[in-house]
Amino acid sequence: MTLTASSSSRAVTNSPVVVALDYHNRDAAMAFVDKIDPRDCRLKVGKEMFTLFGPQFVSELQQRGFDIFLDLKFHDIPNTAAHAVAAAADLGVWMVNVHASGGARMMAAAREALVPFGKDAPLLIAVTVLTSMEASDLADLGVTLSPADYAERLAALTQKCGLDGVVCSAQEAVRFKQVFGQEFKLVTPGIRPQGSDAGDQRRIMTPEQALAAGVDYMVIGRPVTQSVDPAQTLKAINASLQRSA
């Protein structure tokens, strides 16, 4: 579905669904995007697509009415991370993220870089523990905490730095809502409708389970992008979430 809209007049959606665009072919990506409605989801653009197609690709998605989560996971010295986050805000994206493991000074600098944008600033989210990581992966890095405990430690640091929320696994959402409050946004990848393949995610939930756990925004990729009828798949997911609410 093609709409004409600027980044300042993006279509508004109440859906918590964020579709991950993981394509290496621009035409294939746009063919998919033109099948879905910006009222049914937001879109996530990650490292591969942004590196291949650049800021213009983000602008084209916005012109079709979509809010964009720019998933580049900035992790650098504070000044560089701050400039990168400000550049994302200049693009008019809805959400941008950094790695919480970059530390307090980096996250604080990123937050401060968004102050001049006022109400037009994107949500600033920090990545805690990648959902593909298990305890053995953390142990290889010298981290003796469980993924859940380490994610909570990083989430606490994120909130202390004044960011809007974190990317976390759905399993961590219940505790995070209790500890950090309702206003602290939880963004969760690894969401798979019932019957979907787990893919490369290790800690997964269905959309209904994620909503019940307190997830604010759920990232769904292949179950939608590889669907024979992605528009209908999105509508079915949103309908199931409304029934569960």
Swiss-Prot record:
Disulfide-linked positions: none
Residues at which substrate binds: 22, 44, 71-80, 131, 192, 201, 221-222
One GO cellular component term: cytosol
Domain of life: Bacteria
Catalysis performed (reactions): orotidine 5'-phosphate + H(+) = UMP + CO2
GO terms assigned for molecular function: orotidine-5'-phosphate decarboxylase activity
Enzyme class: lyase
Pathway terms, separated by semicolons: Pyrimidine metabolism; UMP biosynthesis via de novo pathway; UMP from orotate: step 2/2
SUPFAM superfamilies cross-referenced by the UniProt entry: Ribulose-phoshate binding barrel
E.C. number: 4.1.1.23
Keyword tags: Decarboxylase, Lyase, Pyrimidine biosynthesis
Annotated catalytic residues: K73
GO biological process terms held by the UniProt record: 'de novo' pyrimidine nucleobase biosynthetic process; 'de novo' UMP biosynthetic process
NCBIfam families linked to this entry: PRK00230.1, pyrF
Protein function: Catalyzes the decarboxylation of orotidine 5'-monophosphate (OMP) to uridine 5'-monophosphate (UMP).
Subunit structure as annotated in this protein's UniProt entry: Homodimer.
Family per record: Belongs to the OMP decarboxylase family. Type 1 subfamily.
Protein name: Orotidine 5'-phosphate decarboxylase
Organism annotation: Escherichia coli O6:K15:H31 (strain 536 / UPEC)
